[in-house]
Amino acid sequence: MLYELLAADSGLFNLLNYITFRTGAAVVTAFLVTVLFGDMLINFLRARQGKGQPIRDLSLEMQLSKQGTPTMGGFLIWLGLIVGVALWGNLQNPYVWVTLFVTFSYAILGFLDDYAKVTKQSTDGVSAGARLIAGFGIAALACAIIMGLHGAHTPAGHAEWGPFNPLAEWIAGFAPQTSVEPADPNFSGGVAVPFVNNYFLPLGGFFILFGMIVIVGAANAVNFTDGLDGLAIVPMTFAAAAYAMIAYLTGNFVFASYLGIQFAPGAGELAVLLGALIGSGMGFLWYNAYPAKVFMGDTGSLGLGGMLGVVAVATKHEFALVVIGGLFVIEAVSVLTQIGWFKITKRLTGEGKRIFLMAPLHHHFQKKNWPETRVVVRFWILSVLFALAGLATLKLR
């Protein structure tokens, strides 16, 4: 809002033309909004939810003491994000809108799940199948839009779209304009190969399927991680900070050329959006730190993961997400391997066996009698190391 109104003015308001300034301002604004309105929203949720989020008895220390804590705290994160982006973001940027579309669509899915759990006082919400179908549908639309936006800067045009080329051309009309052409003609429908300068593996229309897997996978990985007080939000802010840097570098032709990464016109504006997320995430931690006054619920975790996934796709740094979001990947893999190994061994021997004492992985360490705070802080340490390692890969080319 302020960008559109004042950026053209000279003098002090010229600062609004700098993404770095607006990103910092979005961090501070979102943090203040989240902290100032936190108690009010938590009291509202507590009054509306009564018994709060149902807690499944996993025979873990202090677990049932969390009974009665309100959920849907993701609304607090989204409040700070909206205000931060509305004030400091460029609302004419299509990458901002497609990211917000995925974020809030996934947040709505999460809200429906949380609402079902609270109203039925059951740990079972919306079926996993329904959530996956809706999640893949949302991701498919977002990836098609991103592919169309990238196609505006691709010499080969929109050949991958076939009979839907007019739609691709219409989407491309919203893309930020630039006279710089991508170094690789497969930029639109390709996947960047790690550690190789400006080379994209051509996938054509299958790029949409690949992007869907990235977005849905990220959303569910963050959802798996959100199991202890403060566990998910801090790694999320570290990952957001790393991708804010990537978005800024990707959207700047000079820096992108120096690092040998693909220049994506307009993608730098995602740094402002991620800055608002960092601020609201820190503000949410104010209330979610042990012992938590509120849980983010699926309202928060699905939207956060969806945002991380769509930013990775938009900046063409999908594989970097495996490193930057390494903690989320480990948590998700622990769940998948636990389920898979149990089913395989049950089929082969008649008795299912487990790799971990309990999955996701943070519960495994709780079962080993680690205090909750020790698990959380050590996972935070790992997450910042993963984020730094992911940024380091930008120069390994």
From Swiss-Prot:
Cystine residue pairs: none
What are the alphabetically sorted keywords of the record?
A: Cell cycle, Cell division, Cell inner membrane, Cell membrane, Cell shape, Cell wall biogenesis/degradation, Magnesium, Membrane, Metal-binding, Peptidoglycan synthesis, Transferase, Transmembrane, Transmembrane helix
- State the EC number(s): 2.7.8.13
Concerning InterPro entries, the annotation shows:
Glycosyl_transferase_4 (IPR000715), PNAcMuramoyl-5peptid_Trfase (IPR003524), PNAcMuramoyl-5peptid_Trfase_CS (IPR018480)
Decide whether keyword Cell membrane is in the record: yes
Query: Which pathway is this protein engaged in?
Result: Cell wall biogenesis; peptidoglycan biosynthesis
Coiled coil stretches, renumbered = none
How does this protein sit in the membrane? Answer: Multi-pass membrane protein
| GO BP terms in the entry | cell division; cell wall organization; peptidoglycan biosynthetic process; regulation of cell shape
Q: A GO molecular function for this record?
A: metal ion binding
- The membrane spanning regions, by residue number, are 25-45, 71-91, 96-116, 132-152, 199-219, 230-250, 266-286, 294-314, 319-339, 375-395
Q: Where in the cell is it found?
A: Cell inner membrane
The primary site where this protein sits is membrane
Cofactor(s) demanded:
Mg(2+)
The secretion signal range is none
Q: Which family, according to UniProt? A: Belongs to the glycosyltransferase 4 family. MraY subfamily.
Function recorded in the entry = Catalyzes the initial step of the lipid cycle reactions in the biosynthesis of the cell wall peptidoglycan: transfers peptidoglycan precursor phospho-MurNAc-pentapeptide from UDP-MurNAc-pentapeptide onto the lipid carrier undecaprenyl phosphate, yielding undecaprenyl-pyrophosphoryl-MurNAc-pentapeptide, known as lipid I.
Record's protein name: Phospho-N-acetylmuramoyl-pentapeptide-transferase
**Source organism per UniProt:** Hyphomonas neptunium (strain ATCC 15444)
Gene name linked to the record? mraY
